[in-house]
């Protein structure tokens, strides 16, 4: 059986996994109305999906030293199915919160297991396949709001009934294809989670600092983007749609970036992406007028989504077989933790009286210093990373 078909089933799963995380945001108003809760509780429900996504990454990495990649992906599919069904059937807020957290857990387990597995399925095309896989994920972010709009014509719970059915079917297809496909045994030597992670600590740290801090700025920007645009004088409806523009710009970015990640030196390429993102943030700040703001938003959306397949390729292509899953799990957990506070920091700064322009320019300036430091270290040959065949990063 073709590995491409197996990869296709993983693209279907990642679409559903990411859809399950992002679909809660358009439903906040429905939760407030149906369950008679306040904005804070509704916000907590949305947050639980992302907390759940971060929580299992280290345990999932350990599980990959005991069980096959395919089995852990199967578990994530079952968790997604059960979580989606739980949300659809939730009679009250406690059940809804538990089910939402379960959906988040499923996504965290999936990412930690699937990304190394995909890199091992196509070791000579890591960037391209990570780009395609990421593009499938990004399509879910674009589709979430329209799907919810259609579901609301009838009942918002229909979106989760449909998600549960699709997750169960996609998981079954993945299992069937995995059984018929000759899969690599690259991960069989990765049996000591702590030793594997410790052996690659320099590479993990390099990845977490650069991609984590960039994502920190991104989290702070996009979660306040609508309010920022309104503050700049953009109409409320238009401001809301600008987020869709940003996410839509990310769809081709994954594919383009994945291809380039296979061809260009990892660290200089990453620094180029982050620098371009910084330019986009500055353009958003200085832009005036709708056309200029839309153009700047496209730059931000395209460049930030280029980062994700490039960062994954940097790690996965540089890690040796005997530590790939363990080290990637630690990197993934570290990056999620680093970026998580971005929205909180921006919110606190705005509440303290700082202006949006000043906050985002300050964040961009801080990130520019990080890029400069990496450029100096890369010139001196001090940033780890290279081909996996070369052995552990030094």
Task: Write out the residue ranges for each language-model feature.
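Extracytoplasmic gate region of multi-pass secondary transporters
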Residues: 25, 201-254, 258
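A late C-terminal transmembrane helix in Major Facilitator Superfamily
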Residues: 318-354, 363
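Helix-breaking motifs and short loop linkers at transmembrane-helix boundaries and internal kinks
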Residues: 36, 68, 86-94, 106, ...
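Structural signature of the two symmetry-related core transmembrane helices
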Residues: 71-86, 268-283
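Helix-loop-helix hairpin linking two adjacent transmembrane segments in secondary transporters
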Residues: 124, 132-179
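Helix-to-loop junctions at the C-terminal end of transmembrane segments
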Residues: 56-68, 253-265, 351
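Cytoplasmic helix-loop-helix junction between adjacent transmembrane helices
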Residues: 97-139
């Amino acid at each position: 059986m073709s590995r491409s078909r197996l990869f296709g089933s993983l693209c279907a799963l990642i679409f559903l996994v990411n859809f399950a995380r992002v679909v809660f945001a358009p439903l906040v108003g429905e939760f407030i109305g149906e369950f008679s809760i306040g904005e804070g509780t509704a916000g907590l429900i949305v947050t639980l999906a992302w907390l759940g996504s971060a929580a299992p990454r280290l345990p999932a990495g350990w599980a990959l030293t005991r069980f096959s990649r395919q089995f852990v992906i199967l578990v994530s599919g079952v968790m997604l199915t059960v979580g989606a069904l739980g949300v659809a059937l939730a009679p009250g807020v406690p059940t809804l919160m538990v089910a939402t957290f379960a959906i988040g857990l499923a996504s965290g387990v999936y990412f930690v297991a699937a990304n190394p597995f995909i890199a091992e399925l196509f070791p000579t095309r890591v960037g391209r396949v990570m780009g395609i896989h990421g593009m499938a994920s990004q399509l879910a972010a674009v589709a979430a709001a329209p799907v919810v709009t259609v579901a609301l014509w009838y009942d918002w719970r229909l979106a989760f009934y449909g998600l549960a059915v699709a997750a169960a079917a996609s998981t079954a297809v993945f299992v069937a294809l995995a059984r018929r496909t000759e899969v690599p045994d690259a991960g069989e030597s990765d049996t000591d989670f702590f030793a594997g992670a410790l052996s690659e600590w320099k590479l993990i740290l390099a990845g977490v600092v650069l991609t984590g801090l960039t994502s920190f700025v991104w989290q702070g920007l996009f979660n306040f983007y609508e309010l920022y645009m309104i503050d700049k004088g953009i109409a409320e409806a238009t401001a809301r749609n600008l987020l869709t523009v940003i996410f839509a710009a990310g769809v081709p970015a994954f594919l383009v970036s994945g291809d380039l990640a296979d061809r260009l030196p990892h660290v200089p390429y990453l620094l180029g992406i982050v620098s371009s993102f910084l330019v986009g943030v500055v353009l958003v700040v200085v832009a005036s007028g709708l056309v200029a703001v839309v153009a700047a938003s496209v730059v931000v959306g395209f460049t930030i989504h280029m980062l994700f397949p490039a960062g994954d390729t940097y790690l996965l292509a540089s890690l040796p077989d005997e530590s790939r899953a363990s080290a990637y799990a630690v990197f993934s957990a570290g990056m999620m933790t680093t970026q998580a506070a971005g929205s909180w920091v921006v919110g606190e700064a705005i509440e303290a009286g700082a202006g949006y322009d000043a906050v985002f320019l300050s964040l961009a300036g801080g990130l520019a210093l990080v890029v400069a430091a990496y450029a100096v270290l890369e010139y001196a040959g001090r940033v780890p990373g290279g081909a996996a065949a070369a052995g552990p990063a030094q």
